[in-house]
């Protein structure tokens, strides 16, 4: 079976995705942001073949993570699940001078995509909050800062990144999935979907041979392609975003 890398696999959706992939026979490598979380991720996915550890709110740490992950590949599937949620209480700037939500949710997936060998499939875990996002292609957050708005912004930018990568590699399924409002630590107890339902479409897009799962450049919910936010289809905006990310990281998408 193919090897799969799942970021943010210590809890919630990422943990369930990793567990289900191992159950399907995939050779899963799990990621946690520190040693303790990585151990939790391994325990939650019996049968995982390896792990990588690294913070995504640091360019240096993300580079080391990519080096480690590359040595544990190659991968047939990469699932970019790790993210900060909408309930961050205040704006935090990272050691790289970036808004922490944007760095974890957008810059880190870009850098990993630029540094890792391209797998056969990529699944980005997005959110329908992207529809309320602003295309902040310069990665500068207007004030006053609002956690829910910046989360929405980050998920729109991630959708744009997924569509740009898909446009560059039309020979493989590269997609973004909106899993729904899932009862996780991020989603909260009032969320409408159990964890198993939230993980269903990301896992299906990573593994299925059905037509939707074999196409790229889609915004997928409940195993169906839906209309993406308009900015995802704007090639000029997407180019501006990846140019900014390339300048920031010094790495270019293939």
Predicted region positions:
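Rossmann-fold cofactor-recognition segment
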Residues: 45-60
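Conserved glycine-rich cofactor-binding loop
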Residues: 10-11
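C-terminal helical subdomain
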Residues: 192-243, 247, 251
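Conserved glycine-rich Rossmann-like NAD(P)H-binding loop of the short-chain dehydrogenase/reductase
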Residues: 24-40
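N-terminal Rossmann-fold NAD(P) dinucleotide-binding loop
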Residues: 14-15
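Catalytic loop of short-chain dehydrogenase/reductase
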Residues: 83-91, 99, 121-171, 178-191
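A glycine-rich helix->loop->beta "capping" turn
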Residues: 46-47, 68-80, 86-92
């Amino acid at each position: 079976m193919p090897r799969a890398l799942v970021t943010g696999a210590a809890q919630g959706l990422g943990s369930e995705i990793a567990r289900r992939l191992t159950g399907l026979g995939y050779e899963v490598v799990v990621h946690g942001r520190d040693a303790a979380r990585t151990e939790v991720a391994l325990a939650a996915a019996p049968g995982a073949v390896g792990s990588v550890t690294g913070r995504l709110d640091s360019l240096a740490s993300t580079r080391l993570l990519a080096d480690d992950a590359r040595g544990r590949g190659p991968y047939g599937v990469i699932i970019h699940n790790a993210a900060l949620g909408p309930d961050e209480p205040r704006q935090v700037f990272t050691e790289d001078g970036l808004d922490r939500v944007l760095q974890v949710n957008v810059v880190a997936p870009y850098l990993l995509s630029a540094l890792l060998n391209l797998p056969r499939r990529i699944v980005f875990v997005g959110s329908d909050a992207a529809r309320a996002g602003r295309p902040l292609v310069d990665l500068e957050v207007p004030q006053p800062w609002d956690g829910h708005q910046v989360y929405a912004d980050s998920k729109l930018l991630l959708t744009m990144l997924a569509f740009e990568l898909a446009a560059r590699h039309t020979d493989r399924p590269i997609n973004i999935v909106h899993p729904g409002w899932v009862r996780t630590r991020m989603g909260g107890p009032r969320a409408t979907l159990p964890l198993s339902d939230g993980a269903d479409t990301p896992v299906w897009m990573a593994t299925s041979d059905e037509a939707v799962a074999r196409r790229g450049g889609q915004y997928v919910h409940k195993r169906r392609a839906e209309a993406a936010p308009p900015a995802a289809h704007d090639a000029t905006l997407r180019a501006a975003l990846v140019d900014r990310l390339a300048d920031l990281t010094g790495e270019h998408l293939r």
